[in-house]
UniProtKB/Swiss-Prot annotation:
Protein name: Phosphate acyltransferase
Entry-linked InterPro entries: FA_synthesis, Phospholipid_synth_PlsX-like
Subunit and partners: Homodimer. Probably interacts with PlsY.
Species whose genome carries this gene: Streptococcus suis (strain 05ZYH33)
SUPFAM superfamilies per record: Isocitrate/Isopropylmalate dehydrogenase-like
Catalysed reactions, as listed in the record: a fatty acyl-[ACP] + phosphate = an acyl phosphate + holo-[ACP]
Superkingdom, taxonomy of origin: Bacteria
Length: 335
């Protein structure tokens, strides 16, 4: 049985969206057990599942505008903190929250803890591509600055995830840079390139450019947290703008535009479906002693369902155990 601790109070639509997503997941997956942390009375308003689910009542929650580190230290009875502590204490195997990203990252590092020999855990998410296959990218903002060795470790962690969770054979790992030549980028990029190229356990394909990301240029893209977060928000913003512009043009373009819209609707629906982030699940903080999953803050019930599905797959694949084994070997080879 896979035990997942869920912060029921995190996210823009909590607890309703979170609990409704949990209801769907419990109906779909008989091998999971959910522990809901939050206001018991509010949770019970939406909870329909009766088996393999429990509620741990909490009196506090971490808000979106709370300072992350202070929040997890001062609000010791908050739903997010107690859910994370359940993982540390062995009462749950993974934790999921749609709440304050910074607070969850801090709780992951300080409460769950890093895997030995991993310098900086990184935030990774599966982003959409035009062919529907998607690609994994990290770091997406867990760290504002990174050194070359961090990026090298992200290549290993991302490759593990793509292979064992998403089922990609020999995942292609690319380093995000301002050109494809191996001499491009800052000294950090050049050193990271060298480290990735020297490790033959990684299928490193070299530098990749941002303009090719949505065209499946790589299965795993490695970057620093500042750049990764900027790229993520650019992709999200561009997708929203394009959808808004298309629907606006059809809606306000008269009869001919509306008829044209009806004709291209199936094609548009297919294309937009390939770019839908909801089915990809949440962002994973890789490099910790247990899976810590961040669902999108605006997650609806469907998004929560897919994030639980993703968490189940991560536990099934044994990513943490494989990472522990890999990094003990990597460190020994560097001694």
């Amino acid at each position: 049985m896979k035990r997942i601790a869920v912060d029921a109070m995190g996210g823009d639509h909590a607890p309703q969206a979170v609990v409704e997503g949990v209801n769907q997941a419990l109906a779909a997956f008989p091998d999971i057990e959910i522990q809901l942390y939050g206001d018991e009375a509010k949770i019970k308003q939406y909870l329909t599942a009766t088996e393999r689910v429990s509620i741990v009542h909490t009196t506090e929650k971490i808000n979106s505008d709370d300072e992350p580190v202070k929040a997890i230290r001062r609000k010791k009875e908050a739903s997010m903190v107690l859910a994370t502590k359940a993982v540390k204490d062995g009462q749950a195997d993974a934790v999921l929250s749609a709440g304050n990203t910074g607070a969850l990252l801090a709780a992951g590092v300080f409460v769950v803890g890093r895997i030995k020999n991993i310098d900086r855990p990184g935030l990774m998410s599966t982003l959409p591509t035009m062919d529907g296959k998607g690609f994994d990218m990290m770091d997406l903002g867990a760290n504002a600055e990174n050194i070359a060795h961090h990026l090298y470790q992200y290549g290993i962690l991302g490759s593990f995830y793509a292979e064992h969770v998403r089922g990609v054979k020999q995942p292609r790992v690319g380093l995000l840079n301002n050109g494809t030549e191996d001499t491009k980028g800052t000294p950090v990029h050049q050193e990271a390139y060298k480290l990735l190229a020297e490790d033959k356990s990684i299928n490193f394909i070299g530098n990749v450019e941002a303009r090719e990301l949505l065209n499946s240029v790589a299965d795993v893209v490695v970057t620093d947290g500042f750049t990764g977060n900027a790229v993520l928000k650019t992709i999200e913003g561009t997708a929203k703008s394009i959808v808004g512009q298309l629907t606006g043009s059809i809606k306000n373009g008269g009869l001919r535009a509306k008829l044209g819209g009806l004709l291209v609707k199936p094609t548009l629906k297919k294309a937009l479906g390939a770019m839908d982030y909801k089915t990809a699940g949440g962002a994973v903080l890789l490099g910790l002693k247990a899976p810590v999953i961040k669902a999108h803050g605006s997650s609806d019930a469907q998004s929560i369902f897919y994030t639980i599905k993703q968490t189940r797959s991560i536990l099934e694949a044994g990513i943490v155990e494989k990472s522990v084994a890999k990094f003990s070997v990597v460190e020994e080879s560097h001694d």
